[in-house]
Each structure stands twice: as C-alpha cells, then as structure tokens.
Amino acid sequence: MAETATRSDSGMFWKATTYKEQYWDGYLAARPKYSSDFYERIVDYYKAHNPSPPTPTVAHDVGTGPGQVASELCKYFDKVIASDPNSTHLAVASARNEKSGLNHKITWTEVSAEDLNSHYPAGSASFLAAAECLPLLDVPRALNTFAHLLHPNGTLAAWFYGRPVFSEPTVAAKCQPILNDIIDLTFEKVIKGAPPAHKTTWKRSTDTLYSFLDNVAFPTETWRDVYRFKWNPHLPLSVVGPNACDYPIEPSSCIDPEREKVVEAKDPHFWEEVWDIFEVRRFVECLLPNIEELKSKGVYDHVEVKYKELEEAMGGANAKKEITWPVVLILATRV
C-alpha cells in the first residue's frame, strides 16, 4: 500500500465527504478525457528543460481528487506524491490506484497545496502538476510552495478546463444558453448563500477563470520559459456565469509579453465528447456532491424545467451532440 500522511482541513468550499463508488464513477465519466497528445506536450516540455534531473525522479500531483493524473504520472516518473486537503478524495484515489497496481509508486498526503512546503523539502521534486485546481487556491502562496518543492529546471504544469460547450454552431445557438442557465441556477444558491470566507474564495476563483488564468503572475526571480497554451479561448473558462454571482467579476492580466509565450487555437474538436442529455446533466450534477440531498428538498425543482427544455432543444432523450471545452495549460520552469 502507498503511504498516507494526514492533515485536517476546514477551508474547502467543495468536497465529497463520503466514499461512494457510484458517484466517483459518474464523476470521472462526466469529465473530459485528457488526451495522450496533451500529456505528450507537457512531458516534451519537461524533458527539454530538465534533460538530467536528479534520480529517482519525483512528481507531485496537487489536488489529486480521484487520482487520474497521479496514475498517468506514474508512466513518466519514478515516484509520485499525490496530495489533496480532503481525506475522502485520497481514499477514493488510493482505492482506484490499488486496483490498477500503481499504489507502490504513489505517496498519498492529506494537505492543502499552499502547505505542501511543510511536508516536503526544498528542491525535492522534478515536476509538479496542478490540474483543475489553481484558481481555487491562494495563488501567490501556492506558487511560492511549488517553487519551494521544485529543484532548478523543474517543471510546473497547471491546467484548467471550463464548462462543456456544444461545438456545432446551430446546436450551440439553441442549446448553450439553456445549459448556461442550468449551471447558473444550480450554483446560484450555493454561491449567493455562501459564508463570507467561502464567498471570498468564489470571488477569487471567478476572477481568475474569467481572466483565463492571465492574472497568474510568474516572477522572473523564480520562473522562466513560461508558456500559456489556450484552446478555445473565445469561450468562457469559468463554469459559472455572472447570473450565479452576487459580486463583481473583475478579469485582469499580468502577462509579460517580453518573457512569456501565448499560443492560442480555436478547435471545436478539442477533447471532443458526444453526449446526450443524461451525460450533460451528469456533468452538472457531479459538480455538487450533495446534489441529491438538495433535490430531495425541492431546492432545484425550477432547474428540472430547464433540463426538459434542453432535452427538447437537443432533439430528444437519445439525441447525442458534440461537446468541446475551453482549456488553458501553463508550463513554467523553476529558475
């Protein structure tokens, strides 16, 4: 079995609190599949900037969730450290990787991304992945921690995808506004009813996502060779829209064009899925682990009307439509 370190956490505004295999099967099925060429882009960058890393090579998977990125990193690194502030997520990830025979390579650590530097020594890692988590963090603190963990020439890879988007223009014109309404109505009560500390986190996250992570700064004394790859940047990266929020959304940018390279591509087939209404609905509902409890209280009755409207717009219960994603990938090298 893999090692597991523990640390309490009380600051999560989203977390699953019980290990339900059915929920996690649905969660992973409802997420986009990171393609092999996506991982190859990351690994090629890592090898080009770090041709002779210390051995054994160590990679961190920060905010591991159900552990699918940790599994992939096992192909490229001798040892993987997968961390998450939620003990349930770690239990899920460990169980899933035990089945695939990978746990002998993985150490599971219950800790927030910002506090990893209290668990692992400086310069102890060659690579660090932050998948679908950076906007949820205190970014300056997290980047300081990542810089602490990486040895010189080590690689940071941070990526995030947004809401699913109907890729065919005529379908998108009919269906996307309804899906956007469904997502906003689903999250409206969660966000507007959040306590002040969680509201601050939502605000920070929303600003970062509406900035397409352009507001994430990489200081010259710590990072070099910063690349920002964006797929479908004409689409919103934030899952929630303004109607779900009761605070101003303030995008910004701190990109330094003299030292950072931005590469953009409009690709309606990027990470393409073909979904029916059930699969679209599964994506939305897996975002909130307690959705069934809320539905049983009648909180989301008004959303059911919208789902019916979307089903009709898609062409019926069995109709399948092409789905794509807005995605950003940031690669940076430790000085």
Curated annotation (Swiss-Prot):
Could you tell me one molecular function GO term of this UniProt entry?
Answer: S-adenosylmethionine-dependent methyltransferase activity
Q: Upon deletion of the gene, what happens?
A: Does not affect the methylation of the naphthoquinones derived pigments and only abolishes the production of pleosporalin A but not of the 2 other final products.
Keyword Zinc present in the record's keywords: the answer is no
- Keywords tagged on the record: Methyltransferase, S-adenosyl-L-methionine, Transferase
Asked whether the UniProt record includes Methyltransferase among its keywords, one would answer yes
Pathway field of the UniProt record reads:
Pigment biosynthesis; Secondary metabolite biosynthesis
What does the record list as GO biological process? methylation
Per the UniProt record, one Pfam family is Methyltransf_11
Name the UniProt record assigns to this protein: Methyltransferase pgmE
Organism placement in taxonomy = Eukaryota, Fungi, Dikarya, Ascomycota, Pezizomycotina
